[in-house]
């Protein structure tokens, strides 16, 4: 069986409109999970599928769902319009991403298949209006879907045909166990179901018993991460916390890390400390903060994917899961007080063309490491993962490596050959910058950013809908400036650059401009001093000869 030629999309009996959409997306052949799952799903079987992050799981369930809907509408008797597909995801960002992927695949059959996302940050009245039109597929988090079911704005008992639970191993970690059990009471007795997951844990086994009926289990024989020819993984030992900041400064300021980078930390406070530290050296970055409005978070991801930012600082949403297992993380709980329990970044969110993942803080579990590393080296693109580790953390990192590589296999985390003495000349700069980033400065920065983002998200929502181009002018990496910024730190004199790197490195340039040609003209037109043009006095007409 393994020697047989791989099954292509054109051999799966798909609707021509779906094949055209797949072609437009540039997919020449299915991934392993798509090749195995789509034919089984088209046969009407329940699926429990495990595949690593970035392997194409969304399309693996979206394509058979759309194919089933199109086939029944084309060949069966005329059916009453109703919701026939339900996709449950753990976070609002994943809901937006799943909706976008389904809509891309349904680009040539948009009149026949409509998709609605009920997890968006909209008022319930507008969502009720959307649900009254009975879209074919509804995407949402369990809490939002259950809310609509209880209000009778969404009815599934007589119409649902296909249920998808995406990132199944995260649902219980996000506190959705009770909601999910209540939601299942509103579904019909018979329906086809898919459970898609990156890991098989106890939560997935519980979900399997609740949702699936005689499922086919797909455990793909693939590593959790791409091979070393595509993904390079390194560790660098930093003797002190100060060394971590010093090394990060050198890597970014001297452009030793090229392309877009994701910086992972373990807490939001660490994220803002890191951002304010980088700000001292004119290195722009954004913090993907669950306290911010959903529109702001999605806008940050969108602009990062467009290449507007090179650095985004993020935390693991699932790190909080085991600590609050079985109950929703409340707004009054310790930690990120106002954070959205349905916001998350480490799993599933699709960041485009990430060149490097830097684990500034050591991930707490092997699973968290896999989810972080899965943000790069996607879709056959190369990537690098660099993990900063303190001496006291090395035994724990060794355990993570053993779980990833298996017993008796070669280590996958290679030592990063970096001579720290070469960048000692930068240490006094980093020490000054770290001293400026106090706890008070971090609190002020978080408060300032939340206030600004709330203003952008709520007060200007209608304006941006009417003027979408102006939304491009909204930046998320502008300086917060609660710390005392010294302008000279943004410049790197040649004598400070290590001798081995002189002439080879290119210090990071200034903030990238918005790719909007009218911006300069618009700013100039709004400034009367810059817009003023002095033409001088007109010369007096020459006197007529008498």
UniProtKB/Swiss-Prot annotation:
Record keywords, A-Z: ATP-binding, Helicase, Hydrolase, Nucleotide-binding, Nucleus, Phosphoprotein, Ribosome biogenesis, RNA-binding, rRNA processing
Sequence ranges assigned to domain Helicase ATP-binding in this UniProt record: 38-218
GO BP, sorted A to Z: defense response to virus; modulation by host of viral RNA genome replication; negative regulation of type I interferon production; positive regulation of neuron projection development; rRNA processing
Listed Pfam families: DEAD, Helicase_C
Span of the annotated motif DEAD box: 166-169
GO terms for cellular component: cytosol; nucleolus
Residue ranges with Basic residues bias: 325-334, 508-524, 532-546
Record-listed ATP binding positions: 51-58
Hydrolase as UniProt keyword: yes
Protein's name according to its UniProt entry: Probable ATP-dependent RNA helicase DDX56
Source organism (scientific name): Mus musculus
